[in-house]
């Protein structure tokens, strides 16, 4: 366990190390879970682990959104795996289903509620008639929002997640700076009430669709979502939901808790367990392809 802190009273306190090299040099370490957040030093640590022949599972959405293409290539070159199911949707299984259950589909669009904090705030504004500042303060009090909520309320978190989904579905790496992003900071109680009068909820939607000319359009913005025609309008609280449109399935929705330590841990451990089950194969996961291949000697 790499950490700068000491945990003398923890039953695993003797496993804590302070130098990544200790992990890299240990031949008994075959699988690494990265949950640091941010790009640096996580990128250097993850890349070093992959180059040392250790598979990595991460929950770090910023790392995957900005460096996922490079890390997937490094993993492929060293015949190990780089998994990131926990980077989008917490406990919602969406990364792997896009490449397994839905692999036969020509996917045309992905859209969803990808940030539980903003969804909670908008619900409180809608149901309890709270102003934005009051709803945000409540989210912070309950631990749903950080002291600095910018990444959530300005749409950065949802942007990183739609980048990952876009890259997986449409065969190219989509960087956050290429996505039009508008958060909910300027949404007023009057806006929410006006939407309600039209039979709609206001939701922060991350979406990507293929256009007629073959280009793709990724966006993150508040949208009016009709109650009568969209399941997303009924997704409340800190829950997330992702809808996928394909030529074979028409549309399907993945729903569940999108954040929190236990949902995130569930997804990270699920990746590690899947890796352990595939001890005789290398699961080569890249943007827009996922193949089982024989491992190199």
Regions found by a protein language model. Give the residues of each.
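General beta-strand structural signal in soluble alpha/beta enzymes
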Residues: 17, 33-34, 57-59, 82-86, ...
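ATP-dependent carboxylate/acyl-activation modules
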Residues: 229-291
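Rossmann-like NAD(P)H-binding beta-loop-alpha module
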Residues: 83-145, 156-157
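Conserved small/polar residues in nucleotide/adenosyl-binding loops
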Residues: 292-297
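N-terminal glycine-/serine-/threonine-rich beta1-alpha1-beta2 phosphate-ribose binding loop
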Residues: 1-51
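ADP-ribose/adenylate-binding Rossmann-like module
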Residues: 50-66
């Amino acid at each position: 366990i790499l950490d700068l802190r000491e945990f003398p009273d923890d039953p695993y306190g003797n496993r804590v190390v302070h130098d990544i090299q200790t992990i890299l040099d240990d031949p008994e370490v075959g699988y690494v879970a990265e949950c640091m957040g941010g790009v640096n030093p996580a990128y250097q640590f993850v890349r070093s682990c992959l180059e040392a022949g250790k598979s990595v599972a991460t929950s770090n959405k910023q790392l995957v959104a900005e460096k996922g293409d490079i890390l997937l290539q490094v993993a492929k070159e060293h015949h190990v795996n780089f998994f990131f199911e926990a980077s989008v949707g917490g406990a919602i299984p969406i990364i792997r289903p896009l490449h397994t259950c839905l692999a036969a589909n020509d996917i045309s669009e992905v859209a969803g509620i990808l940030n539980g904090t903003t969804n909670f705030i908008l619900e409180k504004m809608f149901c309890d008639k709270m102003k934005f500042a009051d709803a945000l303060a409540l989210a912070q009090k309950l631990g749903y929002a950080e002291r600095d909520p910018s990444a959530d309320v300005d749409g950065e978190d949802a942007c990183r997640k739609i980048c990952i989904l876009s890259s997986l579905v449409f065969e190219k790496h989509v960087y956050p700076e290429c996505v039009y992003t508008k958060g909910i900071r300027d949404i007023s109680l009057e806006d929410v009430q006006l939407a309600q009068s039209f039979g709609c909820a206001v939701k922060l939607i991350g979406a990507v669709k293929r256009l007629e000319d073959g280009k793709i359009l990724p966006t993150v913005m508040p949208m009016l979502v009709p109650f009568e025609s969209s399941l997303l309008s009924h997704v409340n609280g800190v829950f997330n939901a992702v809808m996928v449109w394909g030529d074979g399935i028409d549309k399907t929705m993945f729903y569940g808790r999108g954040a929190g330590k236990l949902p995130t841990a569930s997804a990270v451990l699920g990746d590690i367990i899947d890796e352990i089950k595939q001890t005789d194969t290398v699961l080569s996961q890249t943007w827009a392809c996922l193949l089982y291949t024989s491992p190199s000697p």
